[in-house]
């Protein structure tokens, strides 16, 4: 295939437009080189932010778009190949489209120049960020999380190289304003080979300032809500429980920061919700409370409020965790509370959450809606709890994933 192929008349194409239409999701092939020089290949989940809602590219036959990154520096390379192209000046150029979302350092077509540029950057390479916490092991490898310094040229350049993954793997994802100093960017590396570490994924989080009262304001005591906006683990590292380790290590770091009073998540996907629930449940039950000690009379007391604040959990997430613990108790015969009591307790929260809508319904319909909502939630809780051994202080049981966000993660 070649991008210097013959140009075909638009009239011929109008007879068979399907031959000249490519799925941009299929055409775009992403490669990331491994530490041994091999390239791992995968396709994006989304391309509509770049190529439009239809996720189609018209005017080319046998279109293949190669978007390649080095595992260590994430130096980008782009090439576009096709067997034939229509003679139509209005056609969108996929090369120009993609280059508008990539940093200026991106090399087009010249693979030798790309390899030389990577090798030059790797000379005396240092991760452009500050280590968060400690280096940790997972299996036979070592990993570290680094907070990028966006005022540093290398840190900013790495951010620009990574950010296109937000568009390709997070639904409704968008670029963050890197000039806004309230953004934090954390990159997870495999550092088994310290000279050439491999990027595993990254997370962005926004720091919302919270007014804590005049006394704290006068004494310059800052309080922030840390909002996770974007969370990506590269596809070849998903399913290895590295996403859970990434999230847990970030949470440990924020737990130790007295300025952070709450950790929240912006518009999570179902897969990230699952990861978060399992991580939060495991951390709560391993380090803080005994599962069997959670009782209905305790949940609406000062004990629960204090626990939530200590764990820096938002109210909705904390309520969900307690409800899951109650369901877990029933499943493992760890409580004297009846299933009916738990059901009524959860239904009460569901009613209060949707009170305005439910009050407009007649009683039979309202009760039916509540029962349907409860049954769906109970089923989802049991799915999340499946495989967790909370009362046995089990090890972390989470999976890697990506999180959706808007506007961005």
UniProtKB/Swiss-Prot annotation:
Its main location: cytoplasm. Its EC number is 2.3.1.48. GO terms for molecular function: chromatin binding; histone acetyltransferase activity; histone binding. Pfam families: HAT1_C_fung, Hat1_N. GO terms for cellular component: chromosome, telomeric region; cytoplasm; histone acetyltransferase complex; nucleus. The keyword tRNA-binding does not apply. It catalyses: L-lysyl-[protein] + acetyl-CoA = N(6)-acetyl-L-lysyl-[protein] + CoA + H(+). Acetyl-CoA binds at residues 231-233, 238-244. The active site is at residue 266. Residues 53-55, 206-208 are annotated as: Interaction with histone H4 N-terminus. One of its GO terms (biological process) is double-strand break repair. Belongs to the HAT1 family. Catalytic component of the histone acetylase B (HAT-B) complex. Acetylates 'Lys-12' of histone H4 which is required for telomeric silencing. Has intrinsic substrate specificity that modifies lysine in recognition sequence GXGKXG. Involved in DNA double-strand break repair. This is Histone acetyltransferase type B catalytic subunit.
């Amino acid at each position: 295939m070649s991008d210097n192929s013959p140009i075909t008349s638009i009239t011929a194409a109008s007879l068979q437009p399907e031959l000249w239409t490519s799925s941009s999701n299929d055409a775009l092939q992403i490669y990331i080189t491994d530490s041994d020089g091999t390239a791992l290949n995968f396709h994006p989940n989304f391309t509509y932010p770049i190529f439009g809602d239809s996720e189609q590219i018209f005017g080319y036959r046998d279109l293949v778009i190669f978007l390649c990154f080095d595992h260590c520096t994430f130096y980008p390379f782009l090439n576009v190949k096709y067997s034939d192209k229509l003679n139509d000046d209005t056609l969108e150029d996929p090369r120009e489209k993609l280059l508008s979302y990539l940093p200026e350092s991106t090399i087009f077509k010249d693979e030798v120049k790309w390899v030389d540029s990577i090798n030059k950057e790797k000379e005396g390479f240092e991760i452009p960020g500050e280590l968060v916490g400690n280096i940790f092991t997972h299996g036979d490898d070592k990993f570290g999380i680094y907070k990028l310094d966006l005022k540093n040229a290398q840190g900013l350049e790495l951010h620009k190289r990574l950010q296109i993954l937000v568009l390709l793997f997070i639904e409704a994802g968008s670029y963050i304003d890197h000039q806004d100093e309230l953004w934090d960017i954390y990159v997870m590396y495999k550092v088994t080979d310290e000279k050439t570490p491999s990027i595993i994924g990254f997370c962005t989080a926004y720091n919302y300032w919270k007014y804590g009262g005049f006394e704290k304001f006068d004494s310059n005591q800052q309080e922030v809500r840390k909002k996770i906006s974007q969370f990506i683990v590269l596809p070849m590292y998903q399913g290895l429980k590295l996403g859970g380790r990434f999230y847990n290590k970030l949470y440990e770091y924020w737990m130790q920061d007295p300025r952070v009073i709450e950790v929240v998540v912006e518009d999570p996907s179902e897969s990230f919700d699952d990861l978060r629930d399992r991580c939060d449940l495991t951390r709560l039950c391993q380090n803080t409370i005994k599962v069997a000690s959670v009782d209905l009379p305790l949940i609406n007391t000062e004990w629960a409020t204090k626990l939530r604040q200590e764990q820096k959990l938002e109210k909705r997430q904390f309520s969900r965790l307690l409800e899951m613990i109650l369901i877990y108790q029933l499943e493992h015969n760890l409580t004297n509370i009846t299933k009916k009591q738990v059901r009524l307790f959860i239904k009460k929260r569901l009613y209060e959450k949707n009170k305005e809508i439910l009050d407009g319904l007649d009683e039979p319909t309202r009760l039916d809606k509540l029962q349907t909502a409860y049954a769906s939630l109970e089923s989802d809780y049991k799915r999340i709890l499946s495989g967790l051994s909370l009362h046995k202080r089990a090890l972390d049981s989470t999976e890697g994933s990506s999180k959706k966000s808007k506007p961005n993660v």
